[in-house]
Amino acid sequence: PNELGAELVQLMQKNCCGSDNWKFHPGVSYRNLLLYRSRDGKAPFADDTYTVPPHDITDQEIAGHLPMGSGACDLRALMTKSEELFAEYPGNQARIAAGQLPATQIWLWGQGKAPNLEPFLQKYGVSGAVITAVDLLRGIGKLLGWNVIEVPGATGYIDTDYRTKGRAAIEAISGDLDFIVVHVE
């Protein structure tokens, strides 16, 4: 799923983003990222932009849960375009031929602005690091000024190599760090 997901994110970037303002970033499994960077200080989104996480509406019709508010037209257009692109994508056709479910479209939710966080070391006088396979937690770690330690075999799922994560944490804490956060799901 990660490989196909990355391919589909790249497909979206190539076919749907006609400006430098939009940037898709592949993540782990369904956890991908779409960034909008305003070049003129104005964004199409505001506090009234409303999106719904897909896991909150399982087994429901999506019509009443599509993005609403400022910028919703842009988000809905991307979602509709993804449906068209994914239907024709060879990787999805191979999944269907193998009796597997295809990726049918992107579902955009969880919008917000990156917070401006004071570095943890500056605020509390201690240095830290994080070990995680989850991009959201990596991002929070970076915003806090922590080292983000990449561990081979860390997947963000139950098949994670916990032993390797533990060894990496012990090695890291043996250095200059005051603490380490190891994310286990």
Please report, for each region that a protein language model flagged, where it lies by residue.
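Feature captures the catalytic ectodomains and active-site-proximal regions of enzymes
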Residues: P1-E185
